[in-house]
Amino acid sequence: MVKIGVCGPVGSGKTALIEALTRHMSKDYDMAVITNDIYTKEDAEFMCKNSVMPRDRIIGVETGGCPHTAIREDASMNLEAVEEMHGRFPNLELLLIESGGDNLSATFNPELADFTIFVIDVAEGDKIPRKGGPGITRSDLLVINKIDLAPYVGADLKVMERDSKKMRGEKPFIFTNIRAKEGLDDVIAWIKRNALLED
């Protein structure tokens, strides 16, 4: 089972990305989802209502505190959810774990996630990639979402591209508009090639 952690700031499009991935990949792969919220199970409920995934393949973890603590320093609640999900579905191939909304320093405990996708959106401004932080510099894949909003918020995608290359070196990044499925195929291709080790 490959575990992919998806993290990023509130509203960046983490849940939308996970929903889109399950919609396009669950027919070919045995998948499940774990979501994290501080005080609610709102993201899990959204997934249950909008995803093609059956309800028993989605677990919502209510962290009750700092979102990055639940995925890094004390990942015990999430590790229990992973164990529970693996018990339900022993042949699970791909488990997507969504962090609660967090800042640019969010990273997953290596026991919890084999790969990390960090999601930002252009509405935060084109300076976000150059601000760095472990989410930007260390994630296996950086997704820059909501590119359709760039003209409305004064974000320059060329600046974001330049700064992402500078901050990430050889590590990949993908521009997306998840709602319109733009860039989604590239994210799926990255998962298949890097996480699932397909050609």
From Swiss-Prot:
Q: Where in the cell is it found?
A: Cytoplasm
Q: Give a yes or no for keyword Cytoplasm in this entry.
A: yes
A Pfam family it matches: cobW
A GO biological process held by the record: urea catabolic process
GO MF annotations, alphabetized: GTP binding; GTPase activity; nickel cation binding
Q: Which UniProt keywords apply?
A: Chaperone, Cytoplasm, GTP-binding, Nickel insertion, Nucleotide-binding
- Record has Chaperone as a keyword: yes
Main subcellular location: cytoplasm
- Record's InterPro entries? CobW/HypB/UreG_nucleotide-bd (IPR003495), P-loop_NTPase (IPR027417), UreG (IPR004400)
The UniProt annotation places GTP binding at: 8-15
Domain of life, per UniProt, equals Bacteria
User: Under the cellular component aspect of Gene Ontology, which terms does the record hold?
Assistant: cytoplasm
What NCBIfam families does UniProt report for this protein, alphabetically?
Answer: ureG
Q: Say what the protein does.
A: Facilitates the functional incorporation of the urease nickel metallocenter. This process requires GTP hydrolysis, probably effectuated by UreG.
Its assembly, as annotated, is: Homodimer. UreH, UreF and UreG form a complex that acts as a GTP-hydrolysis-dependent molecular chaperone, activating the urease apoprotein by helping to assemble the nickel containing metallocenter of UreC. The UreE protein probably delivers the nickel.
Q: What protein family is recorded?
A: Belongs to the SIMIBI class G3E GTPase family. UreG subfamily.
Name-wise, this protein is: Urease accessory protein UreG
Q: Which organism is it from?
A: Helicobacter pylori (strain Shi470)
